[in-house]
Design a protein with these regions (language model features):
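Short alpha-helix in the alpha/beta-hydrolase fold that links the catalytic acid
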Residues: 67-68, 185-191, 200-210, 224-231
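Short beta-strand/loop motif that positions the catalytic acidic residue
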Residues: 174-176, 180
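Serine-hydrolase catalytic machinery in alpha/beta-hydrolase-like enzymes
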Residues: 23, 27-128, 132, 138-141, ...
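Bacterial N-terminal signal peptides that target proteins for export
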Residues: 2-13
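Active-site-adjacent mobile loop/cap segments within catalytic or ligand-binding domains
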Residues: 243-257
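Acidic catalytic loop of the alpha/beta-hydrolase fold
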Residues: 180-183, 251-252
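Short, proline-enriched alpha-helix->beta-strand connector loops that line the catalytic pocket
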Residues: 167-172, 237-241
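A domain-start/cap signature at the N-terminus of enzymes
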Residues: 18-51, 77, 126-154, 158-160, ...
Length: 285
């Protein structure tokens, strides 16, 4: 009976949240695209609220990511709306590299943002992007290509830096595990998804630090046995770069549901609450 009572207390909030999660579709250049939306109970349509875009990993989907990242409890507490687009293709991924036969997903996100802003009461100074794995790449690419409409970015398990980014300094936070079995921490061949080669997370974060005019060497804080924080100080133009290294961590969402096949999920930090605190501190100027 004790265990049953505990289970009820844990699952009831998720059941209530699920009632507020809805799937939507809209036509984009003749193609049907879909997204999941979560609206907190406090939303009344008259007071502008923050908007968090959340992107799923390769082969996953928006609904899974919304529950995996579990920003919903934070949305209830702080009053922001969550929008999670679905990828495309038979393997459900985001097209960031001009793949033939697929829509440009950076353009898709821009169109979806315009749609949400036209149909909801959104604070345009507090629009944010975060994601897991392939979704972390989406958030990173948006930071590079569309920094004037998004205020801050959070990338989990994959963070990338492209050459030729817009000059605008951006606040970006990244998480990566040193024992990631899918995307090597220090770079190399990815163990899925067509096996592309990616630079390591430390290299990508260093690229963002240079882009933002930050100090080349980060301030390192060992927060716990598994969590090291690297903060790049002195950034210019409102930029900020913070990197959480999960020592022994896998291809997982810190503080999220464990996925043993993808390695360690640390319980020593919660990526969602940490990312939201970072977002809340960095609205558009």
């Amino acid at each position: 009976m004790k265990h049953k009572s505990l289970l009820t207390r844990v699952t009831l909030p998720l059941a209530v949240m699920a009632l507020a999660v809805s799937m939507w579709g809209w036509a984009l250049e003749g193609e049907q695209r879909t997204f999941v939306r979560y609206v907190p109970p406090s939303y009344n349509g008259t007071r502008p609220v923050p908007l968090v875009f959340e992107f799923h990993g390769y082969g996953s989907n928006a609904l899974v990511q919304v529950f995996y990242g579990n920003f919903m409890s934070l949305a209830d507490r702080y009053g922001f709306v969550i929008v999670a687009p679905n990828g495309q293709g038979s393997d459900r991924h985001f097209n960031l590299t001009g793949e033939a036969g697929l829509q440009d997903d950076v353009a898709m996100v821009g169109a979806l943002l315009e749609h949400i802003e036209a149909t909801m009461c959104v604070d345009q100074t507090r629009v944010f992007a975060t994601g897991m794995s392939d979704g972390g790449a989406v958030a990173s690419v948006l930071a590079c290509r569309d920094p004037d409409r998004f205020a801050a970015f959070g990338a989990v398990a994959v963070v990338v830096y492209e050459s030729g980014c817009a000059d605008t300094s951006v606040p970006i936070m990244a998480f990566a595990g040193t024992a990631d079995p899918v995307v090597p921490f220090n770079g190399g061949v990815v163990n899925c998804c067509g096996h592309p080669t990616l630079p390591g997370a430390p290299s990508a974060v260093a690229g963002w630090a240079q882009h933002d005019g930050c100090a080349a060497t980060p301030v390192v804080d060992q927060l716990s046995t598994q969590v090291q924080r690297r903060t790049y100080a002195g950034c210019t133009g409102g930029g900020a770069v913070v990197f959480y290294v999960i020592q022994g961590g896998g291809h997982t969402w810190p503080g999220g549901l464990p996925v043993p096949s993808l390695g360690l999920t640390t319980r020593q930090i919660n990526a969602s609450s940490t990312i939201w605190s970072f977002f809340a501190a960095h609205p558009l100027a």
